[in-house]
Regions:
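N-terminal glycine-rich phosphate-binding loop for ADP-containing cofactors
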Residues: 1-177
């Protein structure tokens, strides 16, 4: 499925006259396909799907991707997962893929399982505070690469003290989307 999505994405971008920028994780997908491990529908992918019993991680993945000698801090991994998804959501808002912050929040929770306790990706950014979020993304980008770089629109919004949701009137609470 991932391969089909990639090929369609490339075709769509070319049709729009845009350039496709490959992601570093694509080499993993390509390698898995070379190993004839196309996924659950094929009966094997990152996981083994025995007819009897529970699925389990395919041990062969460690042949090319062995565990690192030094494992990252769990809290840092959690932060990276939350922040990179929030940054991508801001990009989607900037590009018009989604037009309403509430739609982005609901979609992130119900669509792909972003943690509900955050209120959604954009609510997470607002809870952290836009300036603090941008500063932390700058730190993450310096440590882990450009996927954490925030769009200029978010940096500008943070500098102006703006938010994604309007502030409630005095004495009122923001209602749920």
């Amino acid at each position: 499925l991932m391969s089909k999505i990639r090929h369609q994405t490339i075709a769509d971008l070319r049709a729009e006259g845009k350039e496709y920028v490959p992601h570093q994780a694509e080499s993993v997908i390509d390698w898995m396909l070379e190993q004839n491990r196309a996924g659950k529908a094929a009966g094997k992918g990152f996981y083994e799907y025995p007819k009897e019993g529970k699925k389990f991680l395919w041990p062969g993945i460690a042949a090319i991707y062995p565990p690192a000698a030094q494992q990252p801090d769990v809290d840092e991994v959690k932060k990276r997962l939350l922040y990179v998804q929030a940054v991508e959501t801001v990009r989607c808002l900037e590009e018009g893929v989604v037009t309403e912050p509430a739609d982005a929040d609901i979609g992130s929770i119900l669509g792909w399982g972003y943690p509900a306790w955050t209120g959604g990706t954009l609510s997470f950014v607002e809870t952290v505070g836009l300036k603090a979020f941008v500063a932390e993304c700058d730190r993450l980008a310096a440590a882990y690469g450009p996927r954490f770089e925030v769009p200029a629109s978010l940096r500008e919004r943070a500098a102006k003290g703006a938010t994604f949701y309007p502030a409630p009137a005095a004495g009122q609470r923001r209602s749920a989307a």
